Amino acid sequence: MLATAGSLIATIWAALHLRTLLVAALTFLLLADYFKTRRPKNYPPGPWGLPFVGNIFQLDFGQPHLSIQPFVKKYGNIFSLNLGDITSVVITGLPLIKETFTHIEQNILNRPLSVMQERITNKNGLIFSSGQTWKEQRRFALMTLRNFGLGKKSLEQRMQEEAHYLVEAIREEKGKPFNPHFSINNAVSNIICSVTFGERFEYHDSRFQEMLRLLDEVMYLETTMISQLYNIFPWIMKYIPGSHQTVFRNWEKLKLFVSSMIDDHRKDWNPEEPRDFIDAFLKEMSKYPEKTTSFNEENLICSTLDLFFAGTETTSTTLRWALLYMALYPEVQEKVQAEIDRVIGQKRAASLADRESMPYTNAVIHEVQRMGNIIPLNVPREVAMDTTLNGFHLPKGTMVLTNLTALHRDPKEWATPDVFNPEHFLENGQFKKRESFLPFSMGKRACLGEQLARSELFIFFTSLMQKFTFKPPTNEKLSLKFRNGLTLSPVTHRICAVPRE
């Protein structure tokens, strides 16, 4: 009897001891989270969040750029959010955006990294690097893009040739409904591939199509709720299956693809006659064998992938939006085609020199970019040193998000902000630049491929409008609904390309 009682007391004591330990551990974690995420003095206001996850569950990850807009109304043009253990501020409105990217830009040149992004890139490449690595890689990429045709007739001719291949690929659909996603992806990607890899890929190349599919999947899965939970609880989530694991597997396959291309280049590499970005990078690596710079194998792979991603996804997505808007706004499409027929006709290819004579087509492309809004919160920046913005204190390490969604739909800036209206970019029949139009961001970390993207958009869009009229399939309703990922892209759809001849 006494033994039984003793055993019971021991069990109760052990349970109480375990509970005490759990309570103590939880209290410690809560206090640690509080001190880590508490708002410093004069910090921008914002909604209170939950321990550990912050404001994550107050955002709709299907449309985070829209779910933050009520906070603008409540807290003003600068407010704070806690995204897990990442403290961030969101800036809204043209005056504040200009102040941020002019007066204090030197203090926010760094790139914040989620746990997932750091594991993928190890702080290498063009997009997610900071400091000296970013400076070296960006300077080299800009120089190399210029050396291999950016702004020159040779690259324009490649665009014209690729536009011809795309037209022929779409012509094979014979006006029947088809999904334009990967044919457009392939065409756009071939331009940057000609610069990075020194070659283009056929539209039926199964290996390259697989790379495009992997890239598309990464773009989408990196922003899912499960992936965000990995960023908050990596020590737990690394053992749990989910979209984050697919991202890591896909990224490794993409790295292997680029590595194989690099190996092929090494077989017949001539440092005196570089053929493309990879050759030029290998030459730069040979200058610094002691690895005293960022020119190493890992950065070669990451920078090549960054060019591949940035040179494919953004322009391709914009073109897909453009075809969708043309099918939904046939009166706009007719005006574009009338301008093409008047300036170019049907017997020659579109050239960049035509752009000045085609204000309406140029305005339509810009309006597609405004409404498509493919990078709605800009690519984030990180505060590199304690900074003051608009009277508020931003501590080192704060992530800065730019509310391009609100800017591109601001009723103070646009006559009909929520309506597709090319007249926003026209004045007295001539094309008009708009200060409140920032699809490529601004400042020192603005898109380094802006000139290339603008050229591609004009050549590809004009070439497609010259040869086809795009229409919704019979008995199928087209929608402007989007799929959220690293970019906002149209939901999967089919469209008809009816030959104009």
Swiss-Prot record:
Positions binding heme in this chain are: C447
Location(s) in or outside the cell: Endoplasmic reticulum membrane; Microsome membrane
Which GO molecular function entries does the Swiss-Prot or TrEMBL record give? arachidonate monooxygenase activity; heme binding; iron ion binding; oxidoreductase activity, acting on paired donors, with incorporation or reduction of molecular oxygen, reduced flavin or flavoprotein as one donor, and incorporation of one atom of oxygen
A biological process (GO) of this protein is: xenobiotic metabolic process
- Choose one Gene Ontology CC annotation of this protein and give it: endoplasmic reticulum membrane
Q: How does it sit in the membrane?
A: Multi-pass membrane protein
Q: Which UniProt keywords apply?
A: Endoplasmic reticulum, Heme, Iron, Lipid metabolism, Membrane, Metal-binding, Microsome, Monooxygenase, Oxidoreductase, Transmembrane, Transmembrane helix
| Transmembrane feature ranges | 12-32, 77-97
Q: Which cofactor does it need?
A: heme
Looking up InterPro entries in the UniProt record yields:
Cyt_P450, Cyt_P450_CS, Cyt_P450_E_grp-I, Cyt_P450_E_grp-I_CYP2J-like, Cyt_P450_sf, Cytochrome_P450_fam2
Q: Which residues form the signal peptide?
A: none
Family listed? Belongs to the cytochrome P450 family.
What's its job?
Answer: A cytochrome P450 monooxygenase that may play a major role in intestinal retinoid metabolism. Catalyzes the oxidative transformation of all-trans retinal and 9-cis-retinal to the corresponding active forms all-trans and 9-cis retinoic acids. Catalyzes the hydroxylation of carbon-hydrogen bonds. Hydroxylates arachidonic acid predominantly at the omega-1 position. Mechanistically, uses molecular oxygen inserting one oxygen atom into a substrate, and reducing the second into a water molecule, with two electrons provided by NADPH via cytochrome P450 reductase (CPR; NADPH--hemoprotein reductase).
Q: What is this protein called?
A: Cytochrome P450 2J4
